[in-house]
Amino acid sequence: MPISISLLGCGHPHLSDLLGVIASEPDLRLAAAWDADRSAIPGAIANYVVSDAERAIRRADAVVVSAATDQRPELCVRAARAGRPVLVEKPIARTAAEARALAREIARSRTPAMPALFLRELPALHRLQGVLRAGLLGRLSAASASYLHAGALDGSFSGPRSWMQDPARAGVGALGDLAIHLVDAFAALGDAPRLLAVSLDRDAAGRGDVGGSALGRWRDVPLTLRAS
């Protein structure tokens, strides 16, 4: 019996990837799709549209929360309380305080949940972990990583996805949205990085950042992160 998946929020650049995975995996099936903005739901899945999030949750064995960041905590809590495992886009909330509160609610529900941080699943990262464990690189003197995304240039953040450029809804700009992948990747290598300073590159309107850099420490060596 395939696992039924409901999409809570469709105005996200990764929607096509999610639909592709569901369509290609015989053990998965799409159960329902919901978004507060009906224009965000593509015509290809129009037959799966439901009028409210609760109905989508009830139809599913598990849910993917890819709504705007300001909606994610509430949707995650509703799904978790209903006993539906949750895969949620990152960041899981707009602020650290909201994220901690969400984590507490998820823990109380005892429902499995995880953010969509995919770098830690890359085979290359697992190989690097083995290289570091074996000491093949010798003594580390510094670490750096960068993450680039063309979304601001190719129109990925337009239309139903324009919320990603609104700090009030997204919570973070490009640095926070992308560098979180790098922070998680370093954590997956064995030690959580400690960030000490951040510099943001602002857009012309000055509303949010289009990238930036962060300095810190990882495994007692200097760490530099860059994302845009």
What do the PLM-derived regions correspond to, one by one?
Residues 101-119, 139-142:
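Rossmann-fold dehydrogenase core element
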Residues 183-228:
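Contiguous beta-strand/loop segments that form the cofactor/metal-binding neighborhood of enzyme cores
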Residues 45-105:
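Beta-loop-alpha module in the N-terminal Rossmann-like domain of NAD(P)-dependent dehydrogenases
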Residues 90-91, 117-119, 147:
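Short strand-turn motif at the edge of the Rossmann-like AdoMet-binding core
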Residues 1-44:
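N-terminal Rossmann-like dinucleotide-binding module
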Residues 32, 62, 142:
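Short, Asp-centered acidic motifs that coordinate Mg2+ and/or phosphate
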Residues 122-196:
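Predominantly a Rossmann-like dinucleotide-binding segment in NAD(P)-dependent oxidoreductases
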